[in-house]
Amino acid sequence: MALVKTKPTSPGRRFVVKVVHPELHKGDPYAPLVESKNRINSRNNQGRITVRRRGGGHKRNYRIIDFKRDKEGIEGKVERLEYDPNRSAHIALVLYPDGERRYIIAPKGVHKGSKVVSGREAPIRPGNCLPLQNIPLGATIHNIELKPGKGAQLVRSAGASAQLAAKEGIYAIIRMRSGETRKILAVCRACIGEVSNSEHNLRSLGKAGAKRWRGRRPTVRGVAMNPVDHPHGGGEGKTSGGRHPVSPTGKPTKGYKTRRNKRTSNMIIRDRRKK
């Protein structure tokens, strides 16, 4: 890994800072684990925008990632590390003795030739996957399941990690980077180590067009719009909106609680928003 600052040969390159990864595979991805991916540009089945500021961007193919890690006790060998346009983390292509290949989220410290294995008896080293009840306290983990057998849902982005803080009965207590502490069933699986590409946040895209390549459209303030487009729009000259901040649909924002799923609240011991 190396940070490279480009020469200011144009305004668009003046502020570019790239993260160079010479260890990544230069060729095409492994074809049997690649699917086509259609962009919906954040529209639902009615064609209405559900998430603003999305659309365009370069075409992508989806890499099928093994989030379940259910090849019990079979040691696999990492063939190569690859770039994945669909996530910030790198992915690793793992070859198993029976000839099957799978993509996994590449942990920090795993490289070409590394061995990874899943199971209760797996050694505690980066890339191995075990039930939380078999992981020692204080271990750094990622790729954490919320429901047994469903596959990893938490701690999957570049540089992310969590810590196994305690075990209480059928639950394991996990401390997240965000400050949240929560309970998860101890039979759920997690992988050892932290996710690769921790330098992802050090890059600088340098220009708006680089955001557009990634499918991100401009962010326009509500007070700069017309009344038909936003509750803060309109007015003579520059105005402050004339009311408490609201979303485009008129709901209060900046602190207004929108969370509905109350049934999991008893699993959260310490909220990430509370200092």
From Swiss-Prot:
Pfam families: Ribosomal_L2, Ribosomal_L2_C. Residues 209-219, 254-263 have a biased composition (Basic residues). Residues 208-275 are annotated as: Disordered. GO terms for cellular component: cytosolic large ribosomal subunit. The keyword Ribosomal protein applies. GO terms for biological process: cytoplasmic translation. The keyword RNA-binding applies. GO terms for molecular function: RNA binding; rRNA binding; structural constituent of ribosome; transferase activity. Keywords: Ribonucleoprotein, Ribosomal protein, RNA-binding, rRNA-binding. Part of the 50S ribosomal subunit. Forms a bridge to the 30S subunit in the 70S ribosome. Belongs to the universal ribosomal protein uL2 family. This is Large ribosomal subunit protein uL2.
